[in-house]
Swiss-Prot record:
Enzyme Commission code: 2.3.1.191
Name of the protein described by the UniProt record: UDP-3-O-acylglucosamine N-acyltransferase
Enzyme class: transferase
Pathway connected to this protein: Bacterial outer membrane biogenesis; LPS lipid A biosynthesis
Gene Ontology molecular function terms on file: N-acyltransferase activity
Family listed: Belongs to the transferase hexapeptide repeat family. LpxD subfamily.
Gene3D superfamilies found in the cross-reference section: Hexapeptide repeat proteins (2.160.10.10), MurE/MurF, N-terminal domain (3.40.1390.10)
BP GO terms, sorted: lipid A biosynthetic process
Entry keyword set: Acyltransferase, Lipid A biosynthesis, Lipid biosynthesis, Lipid metabolism, Repeat, Transferase
Enzymatic reactions: a UDP-3-O-[(3R)-3-hydroxyacyl]-alpha-D-glucosamine + a (3R)-hydroxyacyl-[ACP] = a UDP-2-N,3-O-bis[(3R)-3-hydroxyacyl]-alpha-D-glucosamine + holo-[ACP] + H(+)
Keyword Repeat: yes
Gene: lpxD
Length: 361
């Protein structure tokens, strides 16, 4: 449910307008002028709210909902209570999101936290930096020498943009973010607390001189339409660049090592760790807490199950999971086999009488 203290209240919409906008079918045409003033989940919705249903796990919430209208697929249409206006849709959640995007367009990218429309008095902008028109710089942000920032971009409070960094148009850099040695395209959304372009973890280990640091002289290249979640860190390359491909969406607290190349339209969930010199193809999806070893190649369209550890190359369109990761069919067979062994093993297996004289180490 939208909280007016934080988000703008959208204007009322009629069910006819909602149906026209989403391509949904309003089953009871007599309710076409019924007004909707907000969006909410099934369990929190009231008579003026629009909701959706697309998962049978929430059937009890659907039966008890007080919502005024609900997007629902034909399969579940008969389960909708009589007081709820039915908006039939083949993709209920997608239709709901369409309306949510229209009603709350301002939430799709961070805005100035201070309702600022220009360069704040307390911001520090080096004289050699070039900011195009309509760039917003919030209080206490620092823009270094030679920086270039395109029109419509917003730099959050306390962000630090290092020397020579280039940021394209209509970008958002969240509060407390640091960016160095990086070139960033257009329409890039960087959430608060990210760190981009710092040294990669490059050392010659355990030599006679100790751990010898390897110079990191590459860059970070972030292409257009990338989104980077809060607290994510992206190391610059050592010799070649670290690259994030166009349209890729990265969740919070992801670590991307030096020289990593991520293709276009990839999805990376939270707390992933990518070791250095790894290559990921286009349209790859990685679940939360996946770890991938260095110098591997993950093929186009591959998917990796959450909490997997990857030590081998994955072919295009591979579906892998486990620790260590392997094709999911093989992984599932092994899991079921171990489960059968545990279930069907000797009744007393593992229950030997302890030696009373054994006091441990």
């Amino acid at each position: 449910m939208t909280q007016p203290a934080f988000f703008k209240q959208p204007p009322p919409l009629t069910l006819v307008e909602i149906a026209a906008s989403t391509g949904a079918q309003l089953i009871d045409a007599s309710r076409g002028e019924q007004r909707i003033t907000g969006l909410a989940s099934l369990d929190q919705a009231g008579p003026m709210h629009l909701t959706f249903f697309d998962n049978h796990k929430y059937a009890a919430q659907l039966a008890a909902t007080r919502a005024g209208a609900c997007f629902v697929s034909p399969r579940f249409e008969a389960s909708v209570p009589g007081h709820v206006a039915v908006l039939r849709s083949a993709a209920p959640f997608r239709a709901f999101v369409r309306i949510a995007r229209d009603c709350h367009a301002d939430t799709l990218r961070p805005q100035s936290w201070f309702d600022n429309a220009t360069i704040a008095a307390s911001a520090v902008v080096h004289p050699s930096a070039h900011l195009e028109d309509a760039v917003v710089v919030d209080p206490l942000a620092v823009i270094g020498p030679g920086v270039e920032i395109g029109t419509g971009s917003v730099i959050g409070s306390g962000a630090v943009i290092g020397p020579g960094v280039r940021i394209g148009r209509n970008c958002n850099v969240g509060a407390g973010t640091t960016i160095q040695v990086a070139l960033i395209g257009n329409n890039v959304l960087i959430h608060p607390g990210c760190h981009i372009g710092q040294d990669g973890y490059g050392f010659i280990f355990f030599g006679s001189e100790g751990h010898v640091k390897v110079p990191q002289t590459g860059r970070v290249l972030i292409q257009n339409d990338v989104e980077i979640g809060a607290g994510t860190t992206i190391d610059r390359g050592s010799l070649r660049d670290t690259v994030i491909g166009e349209g890729t969406k990265i969740d919070n607290q992801v670590q991307i090592g030096h020289n990593v190349t991520i293709g276009r339209r990839c999805l990376l969930a939270a707390q992933i760790g990518l070791a250095g010199s790894l290559t990921i193809g286009d349209n790859v999806a990685l679940g939360a807490k996946v770890g991938i070893n260095n110098h591997l190649h993950i093929g186009d369209g591959a998917q990796v199950v959450a909490m997997s550890g990857v030590k081998d190359d994955i072919p295009p369109n591979g579906r892998w999971g486990g620790y260590f990761a392997k094709p999911t069919r093989q992984w599932y067979r092994e899991l079921f086999a171990v489960e059968r062994l545990a279930r069907d093993g000797a009744p007393n297996a593992g229950s030997a009488t302890p030696d009373p004289t054994d006091r441990g180490a």
